[in-house]
């Protein structure tokens, strides 16, 4: 039966914050079916593709997405009907040209992405392949090392912590399932530690981590390391630390305003702040350490810490190949965060990952703070052998859904699932040089495939 698109239908559903988002169904002539739900961010980069919302305060406080849904059910459906779902590049190119804007503001990135992902899922169903294997069909796959956001702050929580994410990285294990077990044990132990130290853990943040008021940002790291030890693990051997300060959120008038510590820091002082932490704690990754518009500062940060830790650009690059190219040219950062809805199509996401890999940058596949039960990013992380994933803490079903999907994939792959551990992080230190070369090549074939080779 034909793999041509027969029907495209969108609806409005709710995300993990109770806000409307877009869900799309695609049916092929063969009867194959694909469905995808689109996530949404809280702290968003100024150069992200546009998420189209209606703005009518009488409906969902202005957050409804009926216009984006209408765009899928009319303009986009008419444009892609009859196209071959196995030609992902053509599907995405058709929608990009139909939109006609630089940031997908006319149809909405949330409308376009929903169709892009649902079409890919339908194509995988047509070929009767798991989604990750449809994207890349090879013998061995890298399972991603998870960055687990166990203490939430910033825009993700209603507390006094300036920095947005304090994450544990269980990189000292041989399998993903062992790493996940460690993460859950540390997460539950952390609750006991926080309570014993007199902090409230009555609720969790958007990504499932605890959100206590703390005396300083550093207090979050200290609490986490205490929990790691009490859970029976060794910091720097079994568990490492990753940070996402989301510093654009506290960058005001050229200064970094750490209100919880009553500090106003220059770019140079902020870099020194991180450098002191890197020397003191087992930190392997810092995401958005400086503001997205502070490119001169990013250059200094990379020169000072780029050979010691992974420096991830999220708001800095917004999964955009053209912006990433500028960063590579200027020697800024050494890693990119991959968020599907920042760019709006699967094809452009692959292009960004290909460019990053060819430049020696690592790729971290990521969720958004407003998530759904959709597990596409788990398959994407495995398919591209990115080696790293951010999908929240060890609570909230919208986060756990991705971890459970990774467990299923590892089980299915058996000995062909490789957990890279600390080798997933590309950086040099004075004590040891660890080189991991990633080459990501986007190939044209019957299905859009990403081929990833990892050499040690």
Curated annotation (Swiss-Prot):
EC class of the enzyme, as a word: lyase
Pfam families: Enolase_C (PF00113), Enolase_N (PF03952)
Subcellular location(s) of the protein: Cytoplasm; Secreted; Cell surface
Gene Ontology terms describing biological process: glycolytic process
SMART domains reported for this sequence: Enolase_C, Enolase_N
Keywords carried by this UniProt record: Cytoplasm, Glycolysis, Lyase, Magnesium, Metal-binding, Secreted
Residues binding (2R)-2-phosphoglycerate, per UniProt: 164, 339, 368-369, 390
Pathway(s) the chain acts in: Carbohydrate degradation; glycolysis; pyruvate from D-glyceraldehyde 3-phosphate: step 4/5
GO molecular function: magnesium ion binding; phosphopyruvate hydratase activity
Free-text cofactor note: Binds a second Mg(2+) ion via substrate during catalysis.
Annotated residues for binding of Mg(2+): 244, 287, 314
EC number: 4.2.1.11
One GO cellular component term: cell surface
Catalytic activity: (2R)-2-phosphoglycerate = phosphoenolpyruvate + H2O
InterPro entries registered for this protein in UniProt: Enolase (IPR000941), Enolase-like_C_sf (IPR036849), Enolase-like_N (IPR029017), Enolase_C (IPR020810), Enolase_CS (IPR020809), Enolase_N (IPR020811)
Residues forming the catalytic site: 207, 339
PANTHER family assigned: ENOLASE (PTHR11902:SF1)
Known function: Catalyzes the reversible conversion of 2-phosphoglycerate (2-PG) into phosphoenolpyruvate (PEP). It is essential for the degradation of carbohydrates via glycolysis.
UniProt record similarity statement: Belongs to the enolase family.
Subunit relationships: Component of the RNA degradosome, a multiprotein complex involved in RNA processing and mRNA degradation.
Name of this chain's protein: Enolase
Annotated organism of origin: Francisella tularensis subsp. holarctica (strain OSU18)
Gene that this sequence comes from: eno
């Amino acid at each position: 039966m034909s793999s041509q698109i027969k029907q495209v239908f969108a609806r409005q559903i709710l995300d993990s914050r109770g806000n409307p988002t877009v869900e799309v169904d695609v049916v092929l002539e063969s009867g194959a079916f694909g469905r995808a739900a689109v996530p949404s961010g809280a702290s968003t980069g100024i150069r992200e593709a546009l998420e189209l919302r209606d703005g009518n305060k009488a409906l969902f406080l202005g957050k409804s997405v009926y216009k984006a849904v209408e765009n899928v059910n009319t303009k986009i459906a008419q444009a892609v009907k009859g196209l071959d779902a196995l030609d992902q590049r053509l599907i995405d190119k058709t929608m990009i040209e139909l939109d006609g804007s630089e940031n997908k503001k006319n149809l909405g990135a949330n409308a376009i992405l929903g169709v892009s992902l649902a079409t890919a899922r339908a194509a995988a169903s047509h070929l009767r392949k798991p989604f990750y294997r449809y994207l890349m069909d090879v013998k061995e796959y890298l399972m991603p090392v998870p960055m687990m956001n166990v203490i939430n702050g910033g825009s993700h929580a209603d507390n006094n912590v300036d920095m947005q994410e304090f994450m544990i990285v269980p990189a000292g294990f041989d399998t993903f399932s062992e790493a996940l077990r460690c993460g859950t044990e540390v997460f539950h132990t952390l609750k006991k530690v926080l309570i014993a130290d007199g902090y409230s853990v009555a609720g969790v943040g958007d990504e499932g981590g605890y959100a206590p008021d703390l005396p300083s940002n550093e207090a979050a790291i200290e609490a986490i390391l205490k929990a790691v030890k009490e859970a029976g693990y060794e910091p720097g051997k079994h568990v490492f630390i990753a940070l996402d300060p989301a510093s654009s959120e506290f960058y005001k008038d050229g200064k970094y305003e750490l209100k919880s510590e009553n500090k106003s820091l220059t770019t140079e002082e902020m870099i020194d702040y991180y450098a002191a932490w890197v020397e003191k704690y087992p930190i392997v990754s810092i995401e958005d350490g400086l503001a997205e518009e502070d490119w001169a500062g990013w250059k200094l940060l990379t020169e000072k810490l780029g050979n010691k830790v992974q420096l991830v650009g999220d708001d800095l690059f917004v999964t955009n190949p053209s912006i990433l190219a500028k960063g590579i040219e200027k020697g800024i950062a050494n890693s990119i965060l991959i968020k599907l809805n920042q760019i709006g199509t699967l094809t452009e996401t692959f292009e960004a990952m290909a460019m990053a890999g060819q430049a020696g940058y690592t790729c971290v596949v990521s969720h958004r703070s407003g998530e759904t039960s959709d597990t596409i990013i788990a398959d994407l992380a495995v398919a591209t052998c990115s080696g790293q994933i951010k999908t929240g803490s060890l609570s909230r079903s919208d986060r756990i859904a991705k971890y459970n999907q990774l467990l299923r994939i590892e089980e299915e792959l058996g000995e062909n699932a490789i957990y890279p551990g600390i080798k997933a992080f590309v950086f040099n230190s004075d004590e040891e040089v660890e080189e991991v070369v990633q080459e990501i090549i986007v190939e044209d074939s019957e299905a859009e495939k990403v081929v990833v080779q990892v050499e040690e």
